[in-house]
């Protein structure tokens, strides 16, 4: 049976655009065919998880049923008359929401094969489930339509790797039909993003990831015996080649996901906004935006508020420091259970905390450090970009291969 992985090759887009034609025509005529969109999404989900991927399909089905019941039960509890909004019930609901992905992430620590609960996109579905539970807790979601929640949870264009959307924002788009003029603008943007995505993923991503990266990795492994910790100039080449591959491959995928969403009348948030910014904190706020904002809103802000409420740390500076440390440690663990993902997260926390410390120091000693381009931030491809590229070298796992294999 035909198996199609999201945005894997140009042939995939031929099937996708043909299937989307009724949706596009309907939008231009001023109506949305929810029934067709549901069938279309179901067919493409089946094509992702059929054949040898069927075990993942069964895991996805079990995950969806479990979490639909979880979210529905928590919503009913939270909105019933006289609800005490128990913190214990909330924590239990969040814990159950992340239980599947936690099992999948940590199973390789105890056995040589992955968990039977794993499937493509489990992390991104978990973000949607947990984010919805937290917004129900806050009272932001006062009306939860389970059919619309299913559409949100299984929204096909973004199911495998985001961008991460929010239930309330998604439903606003899902419930309305954009006027023809606005939809024409969405289609124009979608075409632009598709073309740019092809350039990024299938051309530049191929150059960095297929043509250059294996060559410099081979040179780095061959020269590791004559250098301290195996570090040599070819390792620098690996750092830049992998950083280029990671950016263009993932940015290309994200552009595809946003473009297809636009064609369906859903304005999924962008994942990148001029990411090679001057300051580390700005770069991280422009790189994989939806993930950064999710962690900021649902982990960092809540953890900082919790520390301040319970007066764990009196200093706001140290509160922010600990908040960033916890945030990026969790983000590192989310990527995987290996040491280099954890170090990657802690390294990013260090970069942001050092940047903030420098800006505070400069402000305190402004007579000696005037506010100008030289003191406010390094140039885009000097200190900041090199530090971030080094973090991607850590993230790649190549140092683990270089040192331990």
Curated annotation (Swiss-Prot):
Pfam assignment, any one: MBOAT
EC number: 2.3.1.-
Keywords: Acyltransferase, Cell membrane, Membrane, Transferase, Transmembrane, Transmembrane helix
Segments traversing the membrane: 10-29, 34-49, 54-80, 87-111, 122-138, 180-223, 233-264, 316-335, 339-372, 379-399
UniProt main location, coarse: membrane
GO cellular component, one term: plasma membrane
Active site: 335
Gene Ontology terms for molecular function: acyltransferase activity
Enzyme class: transferase
Intramembrane region(s): 146-175, 275-310
Localisation per UniProt entry: Cell membrane
Tagged with keyword Lipoprotein: no
GO BP annotations listed: lipoteichoic acid biosynthetic process
Extracellular side of membrane: 1-9, 50-53, 112-121, 224-232, 336-338, 400-405
Domain notes: Consists of a ring of transmembrane domains, which shield a highly conserved extracellular structural funnel extending into the middle of the lipid bilayer. The conserved catalytic His residue is located at the bottom of this funnel and is connected to the intracellular DltC through a narrow tunnel.
Family: Belongs to the membrane-bound acyltransferase family.
Database matches in NCBIfam families: LTA_dltB
Name of protein: Teichoic acid D-alanyltransferase
Source organism of the structure: Lacticaseibacillus rhamnosus
């Amino acid at each position: 049976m035909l198996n199609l992985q999201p945005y894997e090759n140009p042939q995939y887009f031929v099937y996708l655009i043909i299937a989307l034609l009724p949706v596009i025509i309907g939008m231009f005529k001023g109506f949305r065919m929810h029934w067709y969109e549901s069938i279309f999404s179901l067919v493409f989900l089946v094509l992702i998880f059929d054949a040898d991927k069927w075990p993942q399909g069964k895991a996805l089905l079990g995950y969806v049923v479990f979490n639909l019941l979880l979210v529905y039960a928590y919503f009913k509890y939270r909105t019933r008359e006289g609800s005490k909004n128990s913190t214990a019930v909330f924590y239990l609901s969040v814990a159950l929401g992340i239980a599947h992905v936690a099992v999948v992430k940590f199973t390789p620590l105890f056995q040589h094969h992955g968990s039977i609960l794993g499937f493509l996109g489990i992390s991104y579905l978990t973000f949607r489930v947990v984010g919805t539970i937290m917004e129900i807790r806050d009272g932001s979601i006062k009306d939860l339509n389970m059919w619309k929640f299913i559409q949100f949870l299984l929204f096909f264009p973004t199911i495998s790797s985001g961008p991460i959307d929010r239930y309330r924002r998604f439903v606003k788009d899902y419930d309305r039909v954009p006027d023809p003029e606005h939809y024409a603008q969405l289609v124009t943007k979608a075409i632009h993003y598709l073309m740019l995505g092809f350039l990024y993923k299938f051309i530049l991503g191929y150059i960095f990831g297929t043509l250059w990266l294996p060559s410099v990795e081979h040179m780095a492994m061959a020269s590791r015996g004559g250098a301290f910790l195996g570090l040599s100039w070819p390792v620098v080449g690996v750092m830049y080649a992998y950083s280029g591959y990671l950016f263009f491959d993932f940015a290309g995928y994200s552009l595809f996901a946003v473009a297809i969403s636009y064609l369906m009348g859903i304005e999924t948030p962008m994942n990148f906004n001029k990411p090679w910014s001057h300051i580390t904190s700005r770069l991280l706020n422009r790189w994989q935006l939806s993930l950064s904002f999710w962690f900021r809103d649902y982990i960092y802000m809540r953890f900082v508020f919790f520390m301040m409420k319970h007066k764990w740390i009196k200093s706001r500076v140290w509160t922010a420091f600990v908040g960033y440390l916890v945030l990026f440690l969790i983000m590192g663990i989310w990527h995987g259970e290996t040491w280099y993902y954890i170090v990657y997260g802690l390294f990013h926390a260090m970069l942001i905390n050092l940047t903030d410390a420098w800006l505070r120091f400069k402000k305190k000693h402004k007579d000696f450090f005037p506010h100008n381009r030289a003191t406010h931030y390094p140039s885009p491809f000097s200190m900041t970009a090199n530090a971030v590229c080094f973090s991607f070298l850590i993230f790649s796992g190549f140092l683990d291969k270089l040192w331990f294999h």
